[in-house]
Amino acid sequence: MSPAGCSHVNSFKVENWRQNLRVIYQCFVWSGTPETRKRKAKSCVCHMCGAHLNRLHSCLYCVYFGCFTKKHIHEHAKNKRHNLAIDLLYGGIYCFMCQDYIYDKDMEQVAKEEQRKAWKLQVFSPALVSPYQYTMTGVGEKYSTWEPTKRELELLQHNPKRRKITTNCTIGLRGLINLGNTCFMNCIVQALTHTPLLRDFFLSDRHKCEMQSPNSCLVCEMSTLFQEFYSGHRSPHIPYRLLHLVWTHARHLAGYEQQDAHEFLIAALDVLHRHCKGDDNGKKANNPNHCNCIIDQIFTGGLQSDVTCQVCHGVSTTIDPFWDISLDLPGSSTPFWPLSPGSDAGVVNGESHVSGTTTLTDCLRRFTRPEHLGSSAKIKCSGCHSYQESTKQLTMKKLPIVACFHLKRFEHSAKLRRKITTYVSFPLELDMMPFMASSKESRMNGQYQQPSDSLHNDNKYSLFAVVNHQGTLESGHYTSFIRQHKDQWFKCDDAIITKASIKDVIDSEGYLLFYHKQFLEYE
């Protein structure tokens, strides 16, 4: 990615542009002293309607403040041909020619420097706090505990009420600004920020960055993102830093074209896994990836592959780690058997449709059924010492805490590119016991018996997030449903969050399904 997010930035970068930008950040965005805060409160009103709210932006070319929501700043940009403005709440730069928030390396550096200065002024200003009360802390750094003063203890006695998180609390719900076809990223961010154990990890400040440049660490950025989500702010967040880091570390996702949400999920988990060095607690890893980072602790499972020789019935077993399970659907070019009773595949308007109901369990049964590899895929059997036909069967050796199921709705081949719109019924609660390697081995040995409650509970999951794709393969949009509390669901459509019913969730098409274990064993 080039240092400049768009070519229109160059028209602003003339003599003294850095100093001019610093003044705007110091006076109107990052207000570090009481004086600058008073100036901001007095000066920052829309020059057209006089409002303080409605996402005020400041023109970068002249002294003009305008509402973004009511498009007063847009009118100014059009009339004066001043194409760049700055968000006075978050500091993001908006280009009216690109019609999007942009990233520029030089301008971002100025913003970070001024934000850091303002933060220091807020923390160490004698007018605000006593110097011994606070220490500057960063993500993953040590911090001193809060020791209340005598005055603060008196105030606490007079104000015994505390803020409680109730079932109606909306902390953690926050929209995300679409930065130009970035709905694929926004829906995954919503799923990750509502993953309970991941939330607990980041909000407890447990990441210790060991990268030479913390500014390039995706885990540090995720820590900041979680703090933003659970800060109580309700205005949409602008994830431009996250987008830039993803583009930097996963270059195949760079650019403003629409990307695949599943591909982004895997790329994000991979980068987070690589950047989690230093977070290992020193204990032996209890997952097939042999890594104790938070990503592998939560998302890594073990997939067992048994290849059985058709002559001597010898079995060769391998176990591979996985972060997700991709499932074929009826209507794809891959044969799908068995379908639920009454199913009938067909093609309508170039897209695949199936009558009847296909369930997630159907897809999992197909995924774990024995598959004959055929004469063209003979393997050398270690028992027969010769090439023989064989069967292959996949089962779950170890289940992850969070199981992500990818319904393969996009089919790409030399002759065909299409979206499969088959409706797949998925449950709110899922029992993975029938698909475990241990269940298969017990059945083969004729020793299958009902598992104990503790073992059975270990394989039970609850749905907590669903990612959907609306539209066609060429033109579509991603949204997500997330569970905030038990049986309380919300639809996340970029910056817009709306309440949803359970029926809305289970009636949706489904592209990525996120399930969380109902019972956890703590080591």
Swiss-Prot record:
The active site is at C183, H477. InterPro entries: Papain-like_cys_pep_sf, Peptidase_C19_UCH, Ub_carboxyl-term_hydrolase, USP_CS, USP_dom, Znf_RING/FYVE/PHD, Znf_UBP. Gene3D superfamilies: Cysteine proteinases, Zinc/RING finger domain, C3HC4 (zinc finger). PROSITE patterns: USP_1, USP_2, USP_3, ZF_UBP. GO terms for molecular function: cysteine-type deubiquitinase activity; zinc ion binding. SUPFAM superfamilies: Cysteine proteinases, RING/U-box. Zn(2+) 1 binds at C6, H8, C95, C98. CDD domains: Peptidase_C19D (cd02660). It is found in: Nucleus. It catalyses: Thiol-dependent hydrolysis of ester, thioester, amide, peptide and isopeptide bonds formed by the C-terminal Gly of ubiquitin (a 76-residue protein attached to proteins as an intracellular targeting signal). Keywords: Activator, Cell cycle, Chromatin regulator, Hydrolase, Metal-binding, Nucleus, Protease, Thiol protease, Transcription, Transcription regulation, Ubl conjugation pathway, Zinc, Zinc-finger. Residues 174-518 form the USP domain. Its EC number is 3.4.19.12. GO terms for biological process: chromatin organization; protein deubiquitination; proteolysis. PANTHER family: UBIQUITIN CARBOXYL-TERMINAL HYDROLASE, UBIQUITIN CARBOXYL-TERMINAL HYDROLASE 22. Histone deubiquitinating component of the transcription regulatory histone acetylation (HAT) complex SAGA. Catalyzes the deubiquitination of both histones H2A and H2B, thereby acting as a coactivator. Recruited to specific gene promoters by activators, where it is required for transcription. Component of some SAGA transcription coactivator-HAT complexes. This is Ubiquitin carboxyl-terminal hydrolase 22-B. It comes from Xenopus laevis (African clawed frog).
